[in-house]
């Protein structure tokens, strides 16, 4: 079909170069039958030429009369995807066409006058209203996505097939792009074979859309994508069922695809922004948008018959609806025109949003993109080179697979210059929306969220009604334009364009152009128009029209995109605005002037460039901003209207817009018809009706900005009617809601429209209102307008995808703070964000910018909160959020909203893909996740996960926007539905797909990996959470503090998002969150006997928050929930608690900091925390600012939920985290969970419940001490790693715990900590006390509130005051579940900068394990472990604690390792590790975690009291008693901890003052716990543990005491020194802690358990003898660190020690007794002396030959200077021989006892075997027998190899300089062989472990619990006893060898004065060298079996 293109609207013309309307005719060609299509494409963006059909093969499909294609035709759209011009893109699209290929080509009428026959032209014209090329372009951009349903000459259905489409002649590529369906090679083959697409687009589209955009490319476009260097035509791809579109998008978007990685993301995102604004974000490159616009335009014309494929995620069905091309085209043209002029601006704004110079990049991108996209002369303008900043952002995004690909961004950048319209067009299109989301700014991503809603529409069948309750969470069609639910974005391009078309039609009638919002729908701003209030648009219809070119385009994009996208657009626009070269623009935006609004869209560099001279530039800025926002909302409304039915009686414009949208998206022909008609008439109507509404709305908004803000708030806001409408149309309502704030009337109209159109709307609105809005209102009220900025950002959150966080944070903070301001401020914030992100329009904008990081977070959270202040009561909180909620759960809503908002914050971030993830969440996401993981792990991880670096560049393009959009949008819910989407995967809740991966795969921290292993199903959460978080971590983090104003849940969500780099990933569906919350609450109740409630019960609060997501905090909780829930799932193990803590802490401080807590669950989160902290300078600023800091925190905590309720919400957040953890409770069992528990929700829970109690408890010492320890130490080790790690734990104390930052934070001097402290603040989220103060009050409304307020100041001022204030903080932390531990631990630990973290870890209660971690500065996670202990203290008896500690020990060990890894990651370690630990701590540890904070603080004090205390702290962990072994085991992965004393000193230094007051109370418990766990650790009675653990100490009390001195000194040496060994009794005492015992036992066996006086004396004697007789040094040297068999066996049987402990307690006791007896006999003053036998593993160090040589040497007469001296030495030798003999006797007794144990165990094994043989099947019994037999063999093999290897290594080590090379090489060879064998044996052991699990699973089906325990005991004891036996044998042999050497060294005539020397039986016959049997016999030759 041919359609003359009207170029009437110059303003709409992106490129002035466009020729007049009459010159070009647009033809749609439908080729059917599949490839080859019979034409060749040439030119393209790569060549700087338009994509031209260079050749049409005769007889080919393209040569058919029906196609009407001619050589020379410029391809504008392929499969309804506007081309961005890269031929590769076109080829990809063509190849992506399966059976049908729809081309819209532009023919130069002048060149081929006869080609466009009037009929065709007319028909097309009817379908695609003739418009200026811009118009057409806008139309295409706006609506091209839709397939033209009825192309005059084409069948209704359009078959999808790949056809070769050479894109312009301008691209005469060497290889004509031959589009092969399956292949797309860089050199495009000319023959176009290969069926276009494997599956029909209708089917493909849905899945494709669902798939992350990147995955789309994998559809087949991936291949196509690769070759093309140009920008992906994703945005061009129509959401319609165009496989090619999808494929193209996919290939374009497949960032994951290595080849398409760069532009694949963008392209895939374009078509359908993933979640929320993700699509936009993903498509996220201006050029992509532009290309999309152009492509869409072309597609639109080509695909005159737009088939819209709607995939109903809920119903799991996809429907194709054809949309009337006329309406689409009209709208599309308008949209396209506006897109052309505005697409650029939009895109520009997006880049600007990124914080890069919007103008240059935008312009460049716009022109470039448009040129590439449309290939129209108008877009001929050379693309401006992308601004470095923008290009960087773009590239960066490219680097991030999940985000819009770099290509996307590139595209974004390039095309922008040529035509803002083009870019805008893409923007105008939903597709385009996706692109903006991708843009670094990610302003559109906010809209994308709304797109979610829209997506939901596509998810629903395209029905005339257009109101489908089914948000179609994730339509699987290319039209993901609306990142919200795919359904919204189903016809992404078309939808956007349709909105655009509506505008386009309106463009024809300028007045009629007014969209639903009364905005003038210009070609330029089709989407915008409906969004814009009449006030601006109507006022200057004509004037606006030019502006709309950019503005409308922008709006069109918004239009297409739901509010979310609108917000995104706003964001994008605003950033351009903010960055806009025109300060007036920003001011306008801020001022709310229409100009600002309009200019906003122009704000994009392109638009600005185009309209720089234009008056309407400012106007446009004002209007486009407003219009953008409105349009997006209007687009939502439109969509809703469309869904409802265009004829439903919505405003004509709204209806028309929706019609266009609908036809493109979900509306069938009727809708399309309406689109055509309504676009004409409804638009006019709207100018009257909707326009009026909007006008008043805008006026009511007081300013365009206000209107924008309102609008923006509208969707964020759940309160207005819009909410109800939103409920009905998740996507649409969202979209519509967006405008609500700005246009109360408009909002009302939209709401009415929506509510009338959708019954779900009220429902949604209710939930939103009730939960989200209520909470937000409450919190905001409480917080008052203290956080107006925050509110803006928060409200912005959902809408403000870009999350430019700069302005957003403050705005968000502000807005969120005020319930009323929530919505309004949100809008303002959004506007500010957009403006401020780039260049704050005013101080507020700048403030927002400063807080930008927070803003992003705030945004993420704010969405859940009332998106805006209640002031905009009429406005829906967050349409998208509401949609999400309506879709799934309130939680889903809030979660999605939060996610979306966060996504919005980071639309350009790698997380941006998260947005589209919900769309393509299915398969595509899976693929993308896999690819991203690889890429992220390799090259993207840093950017995605690293908070600092990525954050630095991402501040303006926080991932939150994209990710949030994705998460928040109804689509987010869909992803949950899509099992394929890994992101979604992590969201348990189907409706909470917000977890969609936004960016490239992020590298998982060890903690994350552990979580993923422990909870494989949450693997994606692991990656996503972190991914999402890292970007936001930067600028978004600062913004987060603003969220503190919002609901606690919201804040927590924000923080989760921050930390989330993990958060999004970890975000799970609201349902999951709720479930987790409930589970967590139950779990807490079970463990602590208290159900977390309100502030007191963080867990419940967390639960409530999660639940709140659904009910209490529907909006805020849910948004937070999603991020948090996911984080909980993903990182709930470690992050959840921290997050709750943080939340609690940070709610007081600023929610911004809290989010990281959850996020910290991910490794990225940890880092994010750090980055956040870095960005936190803004957070600190906000925090410092009274409103943001304490007021916000307090308000938010206290006020939002209503004082304590708010805290409860915070607790809820924590609970949420906890909830996730609760779900992960299973993981809690894991060692890692210990950290989490203590840090995360458990902390919140317990804190909430037991915080008061625990305030007096012992726990919290290490963690808090770290904080208190002082900034210095902490800042060193904790600051970075510890900080990240401990930051969360120390969040409350954050002030203390950042070195300088700590104190700054504590002092609430964010500015000081802006660098470090800010970072820490971010990490702690409530920068220390100040948030603590506020948060504490809120969190600890009971007792804490009061104390907290005062404590807060104290902690803030300094760490030392922490004792009382710290306690409060601890309380707060407990409530928050985060900071107190951080602060105290940090403070105490910090003094010892390196150890500080370690100390805090051990102090945490990790005991030895913690100490080990302590060695690792990253040990902070252990503090959580300690918290776990604390929990135990709280909830359990001392004994219980011991067992738990046993778990803790495991947990510690695991957490330790995670910690180690985490530790490596400053941010991750604490959070991740701790969170994971949290799970391990599952029972009481969670509460303990909170208490741990307090306890830690108090513990610190005792520790401060005595350095042993610190050691005691480490000892508390179960591993501690066996410090050496347990530590080794626990520290297997970690370096040994520094000497406990040093740590103690460090802790003591920090803790002395910190814990002085509060420490004592808690220390006892902690001590008890620790003491029980670590007898050795408890060695220092002064230590808290010892002091606090008298009961447990009773068992090990004496041991602990005796160990205390040696332990303190020995602990450091534990690993290698026998002296470090704890005495068996101690180990036995540890029996209650199996793990610890086991480790202890193993260690003890290896190293003497505890030094008795005899041991000390023996050691002293040995040293003296060695000093005088060097020949005995090797054998007797107590300090000898020779390797032993046990050294090499270490870690292989970590649990054996505990088992052995149980059964071998007797043996150990005997051993110890014998040893002690010997020691007593030989007791001496030499404390250092260690049992020579134990200390000197001469057996291992000396070979038998060498021993003989030594004997010979000793036989030689020793020349002593003095006979007396010689005699004295001989006497000592005799004494030592006697001592060793005693020891050997005791060892023999122990061996006898061990043999008895072995017999008993074997008997037990026989019983078990008999039982199993009777119960199990023969094959199962065989498995059991084989396993048992192999267990014996493998253990013995390992022992043998370990002994031999140790012996060889010792001999090698002992070789002298003179050793021959042969001997050395021989030994080396032996060692190599043995090492290989040992490694093989280890593998066998691993295999055996797997088999053991299999057997256990089998037996679990047959055996009772008791029988199963018997079996497990038997198996464990079997290996443990074997190892113990070998240990004893080695020790006996060593002792015998030592005795023999001593005897040989004695003179033959020597007679001891004491009388005959008693020799061990084996040596009684040994003859002295002289031959006299001095000892009554000749010693048998000792040979070392090893």
From Swiss-Prot:
GO terms for molecular function: actin binding; actin filament binding. The modification Phosphothreonine is found at residue 909. Disruption phenotype: Death at birth due to defects in neural tube closure causing exencephaly, acrania, facial clefting and spina bifida. Residues 1513-1524 have a biased composition (Pro residues). Signal peptide: none annotated. Residues 1659-1947 form the ASD2 domain. Residues 430-440, 630-645, 774-785, 895-908, 1004-1020, 1134-1146, 1634-1654 have a biased composition (Basic and acidic residues). GO terms for cellular component: adherens junction; apical junction complex; apical part of cell; apical plasma membrane; cytoplasm; cytoskeleton; microtubule. Residues 1-21, 152-199, 211-239, 265-285, 342-463, 564-1055, 1083-1102, 1107-1223, 1304-1425, 1446-1654 are annotated as: Disordered. Residues 24-109 form the PDZ domain. Its main location: other. Residues 357-376, 415-425, 595-607, 653-677, 1366-1399, 1581-1630 have a biased composition (Polar residues). It holds the Pfam family ASD2. It is found in: Cell junction, Adherens junction; Cytoplasm, Cytoskeleton; Apical cell membrane. Residues 747-761, 796-814, 865-874, 1114-1127, 1307-1318, 1455-1469 have a biased composition (Low complexity). Residues 1844-1890 form a coiled coil. GO terms for biological process: actin cytoskeleton organization; apical protein localization; cell morphogenesis; cellular pigment accumulation; columnar/cuboidal epithelial cell development; neural tube closure; pattern specification process; regulation of cell shape. Interacts with F-actin. Interacts with ROCK1. The ASD1 domain mediates F-actin binding. The ASD2 domain mediates the interaction with ROCK1 and is required for apical constriction induction. This is Protein Shroom3. It comes from Mus musculus (Mouse). The lineage of its organism: Eukaryota, Metazoa, Chordata, Craniata, Vertebrata. The gene is Shroom3.
């Amino acid at each position: 079909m041919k359609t003359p293109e009207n170029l009437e609207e110059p303003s709409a013309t992106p490129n002035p170069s466009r020729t007049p309307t009459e010159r070009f005719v647009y033809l749609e060609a439908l080729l059917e039958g599949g490839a080859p299509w019979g034409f060749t494409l040439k030119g393209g963006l790569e060549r700087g030429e338009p994509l031209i059909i260079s050749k049409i093969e005769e007889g080919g499909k393209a040569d058919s009369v029906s196609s009407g294609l001619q050589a020379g035709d410029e391809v504008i759209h392929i499969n309804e995807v506007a081309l961005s011009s890269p031929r590769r893109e076109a080829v990809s699209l063509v190849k992506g066409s399966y059976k049908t290929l729809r081309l819209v080509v532009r023919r130069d009428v002048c060149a081929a006058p006869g080609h466009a026959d009037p009929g065709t032209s007319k028909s097309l014209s009817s379908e695609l209203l003739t418009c200026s090329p811009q118009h057409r372009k806008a139309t295409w951009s706006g609506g091209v996505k839709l397939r033209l349903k009825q192309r005059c000459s084409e069948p209704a259905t359009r078959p999808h097939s790949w056809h070769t489409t050479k894109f312009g002649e301008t691209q005469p590529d060497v290889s004509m792009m031959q589009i092969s369906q399956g292949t797309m090679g860089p050199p495009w083959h000319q023959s176009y074979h290969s069926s276009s697409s494997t599956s029909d687009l209708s089917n493909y589209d849905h899945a494709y859309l669902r798939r992350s955009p990147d995955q789309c490319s994998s559809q087949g476009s991936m291949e196509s994508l690769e070759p093309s260097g140009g920008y992906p035509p994703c945005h061009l791809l129509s959401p319609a069922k165009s496989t090619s579109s999808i494929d193209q998008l996919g290939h374009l978007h497949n960032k994951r695809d290595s080849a398409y990685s760069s532009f694949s993301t963008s392209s895939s995102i374009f078509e359908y922004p993933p979640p929320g604004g993700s699509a936009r974000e993903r498509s996220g490159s201006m050029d992509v948008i532009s290309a999309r616009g152009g492509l869409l335009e072309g597609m639109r014309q080509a695909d005159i018959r737009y088939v819209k494929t709607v995939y109903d995620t809920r119903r799991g069905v996809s429907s194709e609806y054809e949309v009337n091309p006329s309406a689409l085209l009209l709208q599309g043209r308008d949209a396209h025109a506006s897109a052309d002029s505005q697409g650029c601006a939009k895109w520009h704004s997006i880049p600007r949003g990124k914080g890069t110079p919007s103008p240059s990049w935008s312009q460049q991108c716009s022109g470039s993109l448009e040129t590439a996209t449309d290939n129209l002369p108008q877009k001929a303008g050379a693309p401006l080179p992308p601004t470095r900043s923008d290009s960087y952002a773009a590239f960066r995004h490219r680097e991030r697979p999940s985000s819009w690909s770099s290509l996307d961004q590139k595209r974004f950048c390039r095309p922008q210059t040529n035509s803002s319209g083009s870019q805008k067009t893409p923007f105008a299109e939903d597709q385009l929306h996706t692109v903006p989301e991708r843009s670094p700014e990610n302003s559109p991503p906010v809209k994308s969220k709304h797109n979610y809603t829209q997506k939901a529409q596509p998810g629903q069948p395209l029905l005339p009604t257009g109101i489908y309750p089914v948000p179609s969470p994730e339509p699987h069609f290319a039209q993901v334009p609306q990142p919200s639910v795919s359904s919204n974005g189903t016809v992404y391009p078309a939808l956007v364009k349709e909105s655009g078309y509506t505008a386009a039609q309106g463009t024809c009638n300028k007045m009629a152009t007014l969209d639903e919002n009364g905005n003038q729908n210009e070609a330029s701003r089709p989407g915008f128009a409906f969004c814009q209030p009449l006030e601006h648009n109507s006022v200057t219809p004509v004037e606006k029209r030019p502006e709309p070119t950019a503005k409308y385009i922008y709006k069109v994009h918004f239009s297409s995109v739901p509010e979310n996208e609108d917000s995104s657009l706003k964001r994008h626009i605003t950033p351009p605005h903010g960055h806009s070269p025109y300060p007036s623009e920003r001011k306008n935006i801020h001022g709310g002037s229409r100009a600002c609004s309009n200019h906003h869209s122009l704000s994009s560099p392109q638009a600005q460039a185009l309209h720089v001279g234009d008056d309407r530039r400012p106007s446009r800025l004002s209007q486009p901003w407003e219009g953008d926002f409105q349009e997006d909302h209007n687009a939502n409304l439109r969509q809703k209207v469309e869904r409802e039915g265009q004829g439903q009686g919505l405003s004509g414009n709204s209806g028309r817009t929706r019609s266009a949208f609908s036809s493109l998206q979900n509306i069938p022909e009727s809708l399309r018809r309406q689109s055509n008609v309504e676009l004409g008439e409804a638009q006019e109507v709207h100018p009257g009706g909707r326009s009026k509404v909007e006008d008043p709305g805008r006026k009511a908004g007081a300013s365009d900005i206000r209107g924008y803000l309102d609008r923006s708030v509208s969707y964020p806001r759940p309160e207005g009617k819009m909410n109800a409408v939103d409920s009905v149309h998740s996507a649409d309502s969202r979209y519509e809601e967006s405008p609500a704030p700005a246009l109360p009337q408009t909002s009302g109209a939209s709401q009415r429209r929506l509510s009338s159109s959708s019954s779900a709307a009220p429902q949604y609105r209710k939930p939103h209102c009730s939960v989200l809005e209520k909470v937000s209102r409450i919190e905001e009220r409480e917080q008052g307008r203290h956080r107006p900025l925050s509110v803006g950002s928060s409200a912005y959150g959902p809408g403000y995808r870009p999350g430019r966080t700069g302005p957003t944070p403050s705005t968000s903070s502000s807005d969120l703070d005020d319930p009323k301001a929530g919505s309004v401020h949100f809008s303002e914030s959004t506007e500010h964000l957009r403006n401020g992100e780039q260049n704050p329009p005013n101080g507020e904008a700048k403030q927002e910018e400063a807080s930008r990081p927070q803003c992003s977070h705030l945004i993420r959270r704010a969405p859940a909160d009332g998106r805006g202040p209640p002031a905009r009561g009429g406005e829906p909180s967050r349409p998208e959020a509401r949609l999400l909620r309506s879709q799934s759960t309130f939680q889903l809503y809030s979660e999605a909203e939060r996610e979306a908002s966060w996504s919005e914050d980071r639309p350009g971030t790698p997380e941006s893909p998260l947005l589209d993830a919900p769309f393509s969440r299915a398969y595509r996401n899976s693929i993308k996740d896999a690819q991203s993981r690889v890429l992220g792990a390799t090259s993207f991880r840093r950017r995605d996960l690293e908070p600092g670096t990525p954050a630095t560049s991402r501040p303006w393009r926080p991932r939150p926007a994209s990710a949030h959009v994705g998460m928040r949008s109804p689509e987010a819910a869909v992803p949950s539905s899509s099992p394929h989407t890994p992101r979604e995967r992590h969201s348990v809740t189907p409706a909470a797909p917000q977890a969609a991966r936004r960016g490239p795969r992020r590298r998982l921290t060890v903690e994350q990996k552990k979580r993923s292993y422990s909870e494989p199903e949450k693997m994606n959460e692991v990656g996503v959470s972190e991914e999402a978080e890292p970007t936001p971590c930067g600028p978004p983090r600062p913004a987060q503090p603003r969220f503190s104003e919002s609901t606690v849940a919201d804040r927590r969500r924000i923080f989760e998002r921050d930390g989330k780099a993990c958060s999004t990933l970890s975000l799970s569906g609201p349902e999951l969150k709720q479930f987790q919350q409930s589970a967590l609450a139950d779990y807490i109740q079970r463990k602590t006997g208290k159900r977390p409630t309100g502030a007191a019960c963080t867990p419940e609060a967390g639960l409530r928050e999660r639940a709140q997501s659904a009910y209490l905090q529907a909006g805020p909780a849910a948004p937070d929930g999603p991020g948090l829930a996911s984080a909980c799932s993903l990182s709930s193990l470690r992050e959840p608690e921290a997050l709750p803590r943080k939340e609690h802490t940070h709610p007081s401080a600023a929610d911004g900091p809290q989010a990281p807590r959850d996020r910290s669950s991910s490794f990225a989160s940890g880092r994010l925390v750090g980055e956040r902290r870095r960005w936190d300078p803004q957070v600190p600023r906000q925090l410092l600012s009274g409103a943001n800091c304490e007021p916000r925190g307090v308000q938010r905590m206290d006020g939002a939920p209503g004082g304590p309720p708010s805290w409860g919400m915070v607790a809820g957040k924590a609970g949420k985290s906890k909830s996730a953890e609760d779900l992960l409770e299973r993981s809690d069992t894991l060692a890692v969970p210990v950290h989490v528990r203590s840090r995360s929700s458990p902390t919140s829970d317990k804190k909430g419940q037991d915080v008061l109690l625990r305030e007096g408890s012992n726990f919290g010492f290490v963690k808090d001490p770290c904080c208190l320890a002082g900034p210095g130490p902490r800042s060193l080790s904790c600051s970075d790693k510890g900080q990240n790690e401990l930051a969360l734990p120390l969040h409350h104390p954050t002030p203390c715990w950042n070195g300088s930052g700590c104190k700054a934070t504590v002092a609430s001097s964010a500015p000081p900590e802006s660098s470090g402290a800010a970072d820490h603040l971010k990490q702690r989220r409530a920068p220390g006390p100040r948030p603590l103060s506020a948060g504490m009050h809120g969190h600890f409304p009971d007792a804490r509130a009061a104390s907290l307020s005062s404590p807060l100041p104290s902690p803030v001022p300094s760490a030392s005051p922490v004792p009382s204030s710290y306690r409060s903080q601890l309380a707060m932390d407990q409530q928050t579940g985060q900071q107190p531990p951080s602060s105290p631990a940090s403070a105490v630990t910090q003094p010892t900068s390196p150890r500080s973290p370690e100390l805090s870890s051990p102090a945490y209660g990790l005991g030895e394990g913690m100490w080990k971690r302590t060695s690792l500065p990253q040990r902070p996670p252990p503090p959580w472990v300690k918290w776990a202990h604390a929990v135990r203290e709280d909830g359990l008896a001392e004994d219980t604690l011991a067992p738990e500690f046993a778990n803790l020990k495991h947990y510690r060990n695991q957490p330790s390792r995670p910690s180690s890894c985490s530790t490596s990651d400053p941010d991750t370690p604490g959070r991740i590790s701790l969170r994971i630990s949290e799970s391990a701590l599952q029972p009481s540890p969670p509460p303990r975690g909170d208490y741990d904070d307090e306890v830690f603080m108090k513990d610190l004090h005792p520790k401060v009291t005595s350095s042993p205390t610190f050691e005691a702290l480490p000892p508390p962990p179960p591993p501690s008693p066996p410090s050496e072994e347990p530590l080794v085991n626990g520290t297997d992965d970690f370096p040994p901890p520094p000497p406990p004393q040093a740590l103690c000193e460090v802790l003591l230094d920090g803790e002395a003052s910190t814990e002085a007051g509060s420490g004592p109370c808690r220390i006892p418990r902690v001590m008890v716990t620790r003491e029980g766990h670590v007898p050795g650790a408890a060695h220092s009675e002064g230590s808290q543990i010892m002091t606090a653990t008298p009961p447990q100490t009773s068992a090990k009390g004496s041991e602990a005491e005796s160990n205390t001195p040696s332990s303190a000194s020995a602990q450091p040496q534990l690993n290698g020194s026998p002296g470090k060994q704890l005495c068996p009794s101690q180990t036995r005492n540890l029996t209650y802690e199996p793990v610890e015992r086991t480790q202890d036992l193993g260690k003890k066996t290896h190293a003497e358990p505890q030094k008795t006086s005899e041991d000390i004396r023996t050691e002293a004697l040995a040293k003296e003898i060695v000093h005088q007789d060097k020949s005995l040094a090797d054998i007797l040297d107590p300090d000898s660190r020779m390797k032993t068999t046990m050294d090499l066996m270490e870690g292989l049987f970590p649990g054996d020690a505990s088992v052995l402990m149980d059964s071998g307690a007797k043996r150990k006791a005997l051993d110890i007794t014998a040893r002690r007896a010997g020691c007593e006999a030989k007791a001496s003053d030499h404390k250092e002396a260690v049992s020579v036998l134990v200390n000197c593993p001469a057996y291992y160090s000396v070979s038998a030959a060498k021993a003989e040589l030594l004997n010979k040497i000793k036989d030689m007469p020793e020349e002593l200077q003095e006979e007396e001296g010689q005699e004295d030495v001989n006497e000592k030798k005799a004494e030592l021989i006697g001592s060793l003999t005693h020891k050997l006797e005791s060892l023999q007794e122990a061996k006898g006892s061990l043999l008895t144990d072995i017999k008993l165990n074997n008997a037990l094994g026989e019983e078990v075997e008999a039982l199993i043989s009777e119960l199990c099947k023969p094959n199962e019994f065989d498995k059991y027998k084989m396993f048992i037999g192999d267990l014996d063999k493998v253990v013995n093999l390992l022992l043998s190899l370990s002994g031999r290897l140790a012996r060889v290594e010792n001999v090698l080590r002992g070789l002298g300089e003179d050793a021959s090379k042969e001997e050395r090489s021989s030994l080396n060879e032996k060692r190599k062989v043995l090492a290989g064998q040992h490694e093989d044996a280890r593998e066998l052991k691993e295999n055996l472990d797997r088999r053991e699990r299999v057997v256990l699973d089998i037996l679990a089906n047959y055996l009772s619990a008791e029988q199963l325990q018997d079996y497990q005991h038997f198996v464990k004891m079997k290996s443990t006893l074997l190892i113990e036996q070998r240990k004893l044998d080695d020790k006996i042999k060593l002792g015998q060898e030592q005795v023999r050497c001593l005897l040989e060294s004695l003179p033959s005539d020597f007679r001891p004065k004491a009388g005959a020397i008693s020799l061990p039986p084996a040596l009684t016959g040994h003859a002295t060298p002289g031959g006299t049997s001095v000892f009554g016999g000749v010693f048998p030759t000792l040979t070392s079996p090893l």
